[in-house]
């Protein structure tokens, strides 16, 4: 690397020295672009004010034919020396006899360059392997140091900044995981149920979860105790009611057993008038008694015109009938009475 940098400096300083512009370059070096004794600085010919401000035809041609050393450094990579460099030509160009006779010149700048080159030539040759010699012969395979430094800088900056930006953007733009969302939903349901339980339980000592659950358990125990007490009271009331109902049903049975004694005695009355006959019956109820009574009256020649019937406790019938004059002679009121008495299920004769 030291050898390549020294050769680059050497080429940059020696490019303007050509055969066609030898005299002009020497004059510019001694008077315009040489060593400044006042400021002790080197001003190369390419940075001269006259050279930059005033465009001469000869200088334009020279710049086109011989580009600057900085452009050469960027456009083409410097070749690496596999062996010792060849001996250098003398730096000072041959001067005419007239020029040397007229004045003497001192070149401390050129002497310093000669010392640098001599020190670089004394360095040992570079030892390479077989595969590396081919790569060294190809100048495009080894870019210049400036290009390498630029590429390394750009690569490192892009790598660090790009990856960090991507990671940050992924963290910012990414959605939460499914497990996190499920855990949030579970906690929300749990909090909602706790709030409902807190609203139901009348006595809450504290607002934390453990106290809410403890108070709810105590309240449930109190409710269960109340339910058990109410069930016991209901059983006691049921037993007392059953005894009371049994007493009532026993009294009703006794009443039903004594019912025939309480009923009135049967009554059958027949009242005849001019053309109408009135019939009044009161006896114990019997299935089909009404139908049999109506049929008996029709067989006796009595036609029912009006009738009032009651079956509330006893069977009672009050009817007004009409009969013909011929039947009055054949059937008496006593015959009608005895026929209705037998129809009611009584035996014997009605008094």
Curated annotation (Swiss-Prot):
It is found in: Nucleus. Residues 174-223 form the bHLH domain. SUPFAM superfamilies: HLH, helix-loop-helix DNA-binding domain. Its main location: nucleus. The lineage of its organism: Eukaryota, Viridiplantae, Streptophyta, Embryophyta, Tracheophyta. PROSITE patterns: BHLH (PS50888). SMART domains: HLH (SM00353). GO terms for cellular component: nucleus. InterPro entries: bHLH-TF_ACT-like_plant, bHLH_dom, HLH_DNA-bd_sf, TF_AMS/ICE1/BHLH6-like. GO terms for biological process: gibberellin catabolic process; regulation of gibberellin biosynthetic process. This is Transcription factor bHLH93. The gene is BHLH93. Transcription factor. May be involved in the differentiation of stomatal guard cells. GO terms for molecular function: DNA binding; DNA-binding transcription factor activity; protein dimerization activity. Homodimer. Interacts with FAMA. The keyword Transcription applies. It comes from Arabidopsis thaliana. Keywords: Developmental protein, DNA-binding, Nucleus, Transcription, Transcription regulation.
């Amino acid at each position: 690397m030291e050898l390549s940098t020294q050769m680059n400096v050497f080429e940059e300083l020696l490019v303007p020295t050509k055969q066609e512009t030898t005299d002009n370059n020497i004059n510019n070096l001694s008077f315009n672009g040489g060593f400044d004794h006042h400021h002790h600085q080197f001003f190369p010919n390419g940075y001269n004010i006259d050279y930059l401000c005033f465009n001469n035809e000869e200088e334009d041609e020279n710049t086109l034919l011989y580009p600057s050393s900085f452009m050469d450094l960027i456009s083409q990579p410097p070749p690496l020396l596999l062996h010792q460099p060849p001996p250098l030509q003398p730096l000072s160009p041959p001067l005419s006899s007239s020029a040397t006779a007229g004045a003497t010149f001192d070149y401390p700048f050129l002497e310093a360059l000669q010392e640098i080159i001599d020190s670089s030539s004394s360095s040992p040759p570079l030892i390479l392997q077989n595969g590396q010699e081919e790569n060294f012969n190809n100048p495009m395979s080894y870019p210049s140091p400036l290009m390498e430094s630029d590429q390394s800088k750009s690569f490192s900056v892009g790598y660090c900044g790009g990856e960090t930006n991507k990671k940050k953007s992924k963290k910012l733009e990414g959605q939460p995981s499914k497990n996190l969302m499920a855990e949030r939903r579970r906690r929300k349901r749990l909090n909602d149920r706790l709030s409902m339980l807190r609203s139901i339980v009348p006595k809450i000592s504290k607002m934390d979860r453990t106290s809410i659950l403890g108070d709810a358990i105590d309240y449930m125990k109190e409710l269960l105790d109340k339910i058990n007490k109410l069930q016991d009271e209901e059983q006691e009331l049921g037993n007392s009611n059953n005894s009371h109902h049994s007493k009532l049903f026993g009294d009703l049975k006794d009443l039903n057993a004594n019912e025939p004694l309480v009923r009135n005695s049967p009554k059958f009355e027949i009242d005849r008038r001019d053309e109408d006959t009135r019939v009044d019956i009161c006896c114990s109820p019997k299935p089909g008694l009404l139908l049999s009574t109506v049929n008996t009256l029709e067989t006796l020649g009595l036609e029912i015109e009006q009738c009032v019937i009651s079956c509330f406790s006893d069977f009672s019938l009050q009817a007004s009938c009409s009969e013909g004059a011929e039947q009055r002679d054949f059937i008496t009121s006593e015959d009608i009475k005895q026929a209705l008495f037998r129809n009611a299920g009584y035996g014997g004769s009605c008094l």
